[in-house]
């Protein structure tokens, strides 16, 4: 008698094309485990990431704007969920493995710092070997979660997480889908948030973006997703040459007007002061590190453990920690 997992694996032989990764053909995990009777290996990966502490913390990590006032600005968690939905849609249309797309998408930003890319740039300056969030995402799932044991994800999921920014020679087509959908998501929702914040007005959008993608967020997303699906074939996942021009203009516009706008850049010095202060404090007083990071310190060294701890903080917790360390406690005098 077959179990639900085996039935799903048989179904994948029909649903997942020759260029996709079928769960039954996975390279497996770093530590061998007994198969689950209900879920495929990639479904288990997605569940493990969703139930991790690092995933829950994404809800309090900045996407673009530091400490925004309002309930509708994106966070690193909402961004991750948007990427996940887009990746499943594209993966299904291209007859790739939706579950692997989902697992990679859910884990792709687990290593992001507090305060978004401003925090990443700060830690890259502070930590000698340098800091890259995609490498940290892999580190989170490999050796930080579960008290240092990691989530023991499948090799395809691990490579996809590492490859989501720069690519990897062993990456799957599912990993390429997630990388493209990551761009589709942040291009559109960062513009939407910038317009909501009054940083950019609709009339300022480059003409090529309006003509090819429209003015509504949903239409822009649909146009880009449709182009990926229509362009990708025979194992090659990408966008058309003419859409690449729009893509490049879109990126350049956001970098000039949103990511590097004077207000955002003006806050970066504060971010570096906060993270540098916390980082140097724990390097000076390693005995104050949480117990979870003592084992990492013994295994990988003090500075690595402190970097892991600081990079995992949420925006609010980093500000709280800075206050606890450097701001004198208020005393009530009667």
Located regions from the model:
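Conserved short loop/turn motifs at secondary-structure junctions
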Residues: 106-107, 124-125, 295
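Short active-site segment of divalent metal-dependent hydrolases/proteases
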Residues: 111-115, 185
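A glycine- and small-aliphatic-rich helix-loop capping segment at beta-alpha/alpha-beta transitions
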Residues: 116-127
